Amino acid sequence: MERIVRNGKSSLLYELADRIGNVVKEEEDGSGVVSDNAVAMTRIGQELDEVELKSNAHTLIVKNDEDLGGMDATIEVIRVMNGVCNDSDIEEWNLNDCSSKLKELVLGDNCLQFVKKMKLVGFTSLEKVVFGTGCFSNSEDGLLEVSDCKELRSFKVGAGCCVDWSSFVMKNCGVVEVSIGDGCFVNCENTVFESGYC
């Protein structure tokens, strides 16, 4: 209790609130949008990736390597579960097929560890990008580019991501919040942050 008073918040509660966020849904009668606080519930001791998540026609839930190929122009949300797609043969993940409608890209912890390049260029509807901890952590000389994403508002990278990547470019995005965790881009030689939408 003293720590909460001293720091002004409970770090655990703050982290939980941050993970919960708001789920926005459209009312069936067309009366508008309703915002609900919601979170995927699990049983105690059960990882989120063990829970069967239901996907709709516009959501891609990546649970294994084969799911990476399930993208098309109708995908609006991509969620990658914890610890998946860590085959050393997966060095690049091309998301261009869903560049026009993708609104949200959320990676769980410790996934896509051998990917060397992630380019999100010209994603006109993209609003939120979240990388969990330890993503892209077993590849060297990698490139992360996020550019010309005018609708992008939130970009978060968890601790220990892209450790040995050499380039991080973010330009011409409408980003309001950028959060980079500890130990990310440790060996980065080229870092560019530019905005044409100020």
What positions do the PLM features span?
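Conserved hydrophobic position(s) of the canonical leucine-rich repeat
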Residues: 1, 75, 90, 102, ...
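Well-ordered beta-strand segments characteristic of repetitive beta-sheet solenoids
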Residues: 3-5, 14, 60, 76-80, ...
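Intrinsically disordered, low-complexity segments
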Residues: 8-9, 29, 33, 86, ...
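N-terminal capping/linker segments that flank leucine-rich repeat
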Residues: 13-82
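LRR N-terminal entry segment and analogous cap-like coil->beta motifs
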Residues: 54-117, 121-123
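Concave beta-strand-loop units of leucine-rich repeat
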Residues: 79-86, 107-112, 122-125, 131-136, ...
